[in-house]
Amino acid sequence: GILNETSKQKFTDLQSKGASQIAKLATECGVKTFVHFSAIGADINSHSKYLKSKAEGEEMVKASFKNAVILRPSIVFGAEDQFFNRFATMAKLSPLIPLVGGETKFQPVYVDDIAKAAVKGVLGEAKRGIYELGGPQAASFKELIIMLMGIIRRKRAIVNIPFFAASIQGGIFDALQKFSLGLFTNTILTRDQVIALKKDNVTSKNKMGFKNLGIVPTAMETILGEYLYRHRPYGQYTELTEAARDLDS
């Protein structure tokens, strides 16, 4: 799927119609198991085009492939993730970290755990239905950024942006993308993302999850430092530098 629309890539085309076409082809080819990746928050009635398209994709997949296993992860962390790495890079370039929806809760999930769930689905070891996948810890957006700053050893001012102001900013960036004839792609903030950020991104009690798959989710603290160290002031040598500084003092 995609997180941002462009002139050539639309949520509906990829995440709704695209998912439907793949499921139909799988059925026609006699595929026995089908695993579809969606997202927590998928809702056919959502005002977010992203979340609505995810829900539409789920329904279309289920219509074509009755025994489909649908995985809905929260935000994903891992070596090349687009969440922690993005804000860590921002912290290296700016003294301020702007946040939209600082109190919105997330339940970050390790990419390897999602892979394990997918494997169980492919091997027929998961019963059909929707699985919401979240890590063992839920935290607010702001709490996650504070934790990140501690890991990368950087102190930055966190600025909360009200939803109404963020919606205006997102609308401006969206307009720039629309009228720039492809010269600008809005990867900063979209109005649709602002809408999605108004709702917590955590697992539901009435949905299946890792427990039903026999998987114990991995805690963030055991993984984040393994790849985010490169964003520290002295990279992998930061701890040595800090230790030497302590000896001098």
Which role does the model predict for each range below?
Residues G1-E28, I40-I44:
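NAD(P)H-binding glycine-rich loop region in Rossmannoid oxidoreductase-like domains
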Residues E5, I40-K52, V76-D81:
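Conserved catalytic-site region of short-chain dehydrogenase/reductase
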Residues F11-S16, V35, K54, Q107:
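Short alpha-helix in the Rossmann-fold core of NAD(P)-dependent oxidoreductases
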Residues G18-Q21, Q82-F83, G101-L123, G129-G135, ...:
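Substrate-positioning beta->alpha
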Residues A88-G101:
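A short C-terminal helix-loop "cap" of Rossmann-like NAD(P)-dependent dehydrogenase/epimerase domains
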Residues K105-D112, Y131-I151, N160-G171, V216-T218:
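Substrate-binding strand-loop-helix patch
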Residues F164-S249:
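A hydrophobic C-terminal alpha-helical subdomain
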